[in-house]
Each structure stands twice: as structure tokens, then as C-alpha cells.
Amino acid sequence: MLFPALALLCPVLVAAHGQLSWVQVGTGPQYPAWTLDDYYTALYRESDPVWGALPEQKYTRKTDRTDLGFADIFSKSIATGGYEVCKRFDDMSPVGTIPAKAGDQVIVQWSSEWPSEGHPGPIGEWMAKCPNDSCTQVDATTLDWFCIAQHNYDAEIKKWPTEILTESLNRQWIFTLPTDLPPGAYLVRHELIALHNSTGPTPDLVSSPQHYPIGIEIMLDSSGTTLPTLTCKFPGCFSYDDYEWHHNIWDDEWQGLLVKWEFPGIAVYPGGYTTGVVNGASAAVKNGMSSSPSSSSGVSSSSSSSVASSDTSDSTTSSGVVAVNVSAASSPSSSISANSAMATGKKTCKRKKRSKIAGQKRHIHRSRVAHLDRH
């Protein structure tokens, strides 16, 4: 039978990168995300509709990337991670819609396999309003997308957002929904970008930045009236002209140029926010208002429970991962440092040394090898 053979492959394939386990919006429950297990269940149901079990309803858009790999920026899958499979399996198992309120915090729980060490890069969030107050089976490539958050390199602690996520104890990432959008159905796009393989300065599909998008369907309760006009479509938001295609972060790190990083695609609309450093200046902006450089990146403070409590919004900064036992009164920058240290425990220094060596062995990319040879 096809299904058992595919099931045996799952443990090997899942280890390649990773996937979401669940999504939580505001103080709501943890909604399960679509995983490779669901994909193989749907695949078996498709081949045997009599005996094959129906996959359970999940709350993120489907993907069929069996290696959990990145999406080509020029393909339709760049929208939410799995264009063809959404059309293929949505009748079998429709994507669930999560209720949300303006200003809610969204927690995305990544699996233990991702992001693996050696995949430094930024994190971004996008939204698109669906027609007729429903995102059910809406083609994400036809929507007008606007950017609500960009999380860039943090020059204070010298880490990329994906590195902060990797070092966090529970691998959760938090972002905030805008407060000025009109109510209705939206697709939310959460994306990790890995820059370890981008060689620059000549665009090359083989040695390219890697985008890992996830799609979440929400029904937004809001009193806002502003629908952003600065939009783009996927594919189309990203191009060869973006900064990420023309720069090697390993060389930029050696030359002190990481602070020059520019996020790909269009700018964040005024109701969104940006963290980190962009083109040499602090990009700490929230809801269109400049904030102090010290708040350019942050981690949320929470209890060790993975369920958000009612006061989470009071102790969470604009970007970050859930930190355990970090005081809400501490500054965002110190919270990140504390989170990184606590995530690794007492073996922080030793682990960093081992991971650096292991990272060089695992990721023998041409750009990194060239950098090591020269320096």
C-alpha cells in the first residue's frame, strides 16, 4: 500500500526544516496547524476514498512540500506555501477560520525542527482582505497583500529574528494585528526568510534567499476603516531587485554591513510596525510612531505555559518570542539577551561554540566557504 510507505518517510522528511504546530490569536485556544501528517492522510484518502480517513480540519493553509522546504518567489506557492495542494484538498478538509480582534497578538508555534541553526534571516507578516467576508478556497495569488510587520537584524545583540526564534525555549513567535483595519475576512501571511545561502551580488536561483511562508485565515472584529492602498500580489511582491539577492550576509557581517539590510518587497503600511535596523538606522516604528532604538526588537514575557493569558498584551513587545521568567519591567533589549541565555541554560557558551562549528559543517555554501577561506 502507498500510505504506509509514505508514513515511514515522514520522520526523515520532517527533520529537513519544520512546520507550525498551532496558532493562537489573542486569548483564544491553540488552533492546530496543517502538517505533513495531514498531507499524507489526505493523499491516502485521495487514493482510497472508501477506507482512507478524512484529514481533520486545520487552521493554516495547506502545503505539499514534503521536505518542508522554501517556496520559489516566482511560483504561486510563495503566497501561502502550497498553491496546488490547497486547490486539491480543500474540498476534503476546508481550512478553519480563526476569530480575531483588532490589536490581538498572534502566537505561532514552530516545531522543534525549525528553524534549525544556520538559517539566519528576517521575519515578516502580511495581510490581505478576502472578498465577500470569506477566505474559504480563495486563491491567495489574486489578493492584494499589504505588509503589517517587518522584523530585521538587531544590531544591539547582533542577531537575526530567526536566530532569536531558534534560541528561544519554546520556539514561539509573536506578532500584533493592526488596529485600524476594517472588519472582515483576512488572510494573514507569516514568513521566515533564511539568508545563509544567498551569495550575491549576481542573482542565482541555486544560491538564493529562502522564503518559508505560512497562511492563516482569520475573521477580524474591528472598528477601523483604513484599508491600505500600498499593496502587491504574490508572486510579484518579491523580485531580483530586492536587496537580499545582491548581498552575502557572511561578507556583510565581516564588513559590518548587516545594518544596511533592506527588507524585500513593499514597505510596511502606516498602521503596521518595523523592528531592528534598516539601511543603517533604527527602524523601531509601531503604528506609524517612532519609538526608542532600545525597543527595536523584543521578546514577550510570559509564564512557562504555552497558552496566552489575558495580560499577555501588557508584557509583550512588538516583535519576539515567548521568553520564560523574563520580567515584564525589563527593557526589550535586555529581555532578548535574557531569553537567549535562558533558552540555552548554563551551557550557553559551550553550545554556541559547538553550534558554530556544526553550522559550518552542515552549511557548506559557496559564499560561506569563500568567506572562511579569505578571512
UniProtKB/Swiss-Prot annotation:
Compartments where found: Secreted, Cell wall
Q: Where is the composition biased (Basic residues)?
A: 347-369
Q: Which InterPro entries match?
A: AA9, AA9_LPMO
| Cofactors that this protein relies on | Cu(2+)
Cysteine disulfide links: C130-C135, C232-C237
Question: Per the record, what are the reactions this protein catalyses?
Answer: [(1->4)-beta-D-glucosyl]n+m + reduced acceptor + O2 = 4-dehydro-beta-D-glucosyl-[(1->4)-beta-D-glucosyl]n-1 + [(1->4)-beta-D-glucosyl]m + acceptor + H2O
Q: Where does O2 bind?
A: H196
GO cellular-component terms in the record?
extracellular region
Q: Which GO terms describe its molecular function?
A: metal ion binding; monooxygenase activity
Q: Which stretch is the leader sequence?
A: 1-16
Q: Which UniProt keywords apply?
A: Carbohydrate metabolism, Cell wall, Cellulose degradation, Copper, Disulfide bond, Glycoprotein, Metal-binding, Monooxygenase, Oxidoreductase, Polysaccharide degradation, Secreted, Signal
Annotated Low complexity bias:
290-341
**Primary subcellular site in the record, as a coarse category:** secreted
Query: Can the keyword Electron transport be found in this entry's annotation?
Result: no
Q: According to the record, which residues are glycosylated? A: N132, N197, N325
Extract the PANTHER family matched here. ENDO-BETA-1,4-GLUCANASE D, PUTATIVE (AFU_ORTHOLOGUE AFUA_1G12560)-RELATED
Query: This protein is called what?
Result: AA9 family lytic polysaccharide monooxygenase CEL1
According to its UniProt entry, this protein's organism is Cryptococcus neoformans var. grubii serotype A (strain H99 / ATCC 208821 / CBS 10515 / FGSC 9487)
**What are the top taxonomic ranks of the organism?**
Eukaryota, Fungi, Dikarya, Basidiomycota, Agaricomycotina
What is the primary gene name for this protein? Answer: CEL1
